[in-house]
UniProtKB/Swiss-Prot annotation:
Source lineage: Bacteria, Pseudomonadati, Pseudomonadota, Alphaproteobacteria, Rickettsiales
CDD domains, per the entry: PBP2_PBGD_2
Native species: Rickettsia conorii (strain ATCC VR-613 / Malish 7)
PROSITE patterns found in the cross-reference section: PORPHOBILINOGEN_DEAM
Domain RPE1 insert: 257-306
Keyword terms of this UniProt record: Porphyrin biosynthesis, Transferase
Keyword Transferase: yes
Cofactor binding note from Swiss-Prot or TrEMBL: Binds 1 dipyrromethane group covalently.
Enzyme Commission code: 2.5.1.61
UniProt GO cellular component terms: cytoplasm
One GO BP annotation of this record: protoporphyrinogen IX biosynthetic process
Pathway(s) this gene product operates in, as recorded in its UniProt entry: Porphyrin-containing compound metabolism; protoporphyrin-IX biosynthesis; coproporphyrinogen-III from 5-aminolevulinate: step 2/4
The protein's name: Porphobilinogen deaminase
């Protein structure tokens, strides 16, 4: 086992918060490992005056970090999963994720509480074509203007009156401790599906680095890792970029397995309900030999915990045509469900 880890990350305040959350998880399992943060300035950070779709897409937030990983200048990289393209460099892999935060978007406005309440021809600041497509679906009269920068700079632009409103991810607002209910209003999934992977912190490593793989196996939040598979499969099949309005959100239908131990959850994946029942029982008791108290009992119908429902959205390049689709699947076939949805929706958009 290694004694030190070099962790590559963007230099933004939110990226550093994400990195420290990963370090906290690593320290829980490997308290003696030294974690060195290696801040890296990316092309996406440097170019702030143009929409991402004009300069290469969200991959610009990863390019320099992934190159450092490939050059073995860092051992692992921390990303917001929403910034990770569906197709990655072959030697690299997302080997772990942290538990998903609430992935909803937030309507940020000083005077009004929803998109519907905005006055005629109001201006919303947003560079995301996904958000633009949903905004125009709700209120075709609204003007959507390019609005880039970190969370603080966008809120400052709003405060100075550059726009009437903006839309930001709840995750960022919460983690930066700037969510203010006086002017921040959550948007429900039924009105605006989140970006694929929104709310998830991802850890990327080299596939052949066994030491990092061992660490990732320990810190990986399995329920979230399985939950994002249909979303990521949808994204990968379409090879979508920042010019394509695309969204997806997955959730467990029958029960939330977030409190199951890793042992119990692995039995879900294997489909061994008898072993699952035993593992779940053990994970919810106090171990007499160690004195450790595990998670509180969770009422679960064993075998149903693996049912996932994913809502998908896909639009054409100008956002004038949008299609929606829902897939309900088992964990074992969730990736195939994402691909199936992509094929069906692509055909519908192209008609």
């Amino acid at each position: 086992m290694t004694n030190s880890i070099r962790i590559g990350t963007r230099k933004s305040p939110l990226a550093l918060i994400h990195t420290n959350l990963v370090i906290q998880q690593i320290k829980q399992f490997f308290p003696d490992i030294n974690c060195e943060i290696v801040p890296i300035i990316t092309s996406g950070d440097l170019i702030q005056n143009k929409p991402l779709y004009d300069i290469g897409g969200k991959a610009l937030f990863l390019k320099e970090i992934e190159q450092a990983l490939l050059d073995k200048k860092i051992d692992l990289a921390v990303h917001s999963l929403k910034d990770v393209p569906g197709r990655m460099p072959e030697p690299l892999v997302i080997a772990a994720v942290l538990e998903r935060e609430d992935p909803r978007d937030v309507f940020v406005c000083l005077k009004y509480k929803s998109i519907e309440e905005l006055p005629q021809n109001a201006v919303i600041g947003s560079s995301a074509v996904r958000r633009k497509a949903f905004i125009q679906k709700i209120r075709p009269d609204l003007k959507v203007t390019v609005f880039r920068g970190n969370v603080d700079s966008r809120i400052k632009k709003l405060m100075t009156g550059e726009v009437d409103a903006t839309i930001l991810a709840y995750t960022g607002l919460k983690r930066l401790e700037v969510f203010n209910p006086e002017y921040c209003h959550l948007i429900e999934y039924s009105q605006m599906l989140p970006c694929i992977g929104q709310g998830v912190i991802a850890v990327e490593i080299r596939k052949d680095d066994n030491a990092m793989l061992e660490i990732c196996n320990q810190i990986n939040h399995l329920p979230t890792f399985e939950l994002i598979k249909p979303e990521r499969a949808f994204l990968e099949y379409l090879d979508a970029n920042c010019r394509t309005p695309i969204a997806a959100y997955s959730q467990y239908l029958d029960a939330n397995p977030r409190h199951l131990s890793k042992l119990a959850y692995r039995e879900v994946l294997e489909g061994n309900t008898e072993a699952l029942a035993t593992a779940a029982y053990k994970s919810n008791r106090t171990d007499a030999s160690t004195g450790l108290t595990y998670k509180l009992p969770l009422e679960v119908e064993f075998g149903k915990v693996s049912n996932i429902q994913t809502n998908f959205m896909l639009g054409n390049l100008d956002g004038s045509k949008i299609t929606f689709h829902t897939e309900t699947t088992n964990i074992k076939t969730s990736t195939e469900a994402g691909i199936k949805a992509a094929k069906m929706m692509l055909e519908a958009i192209c008609k």
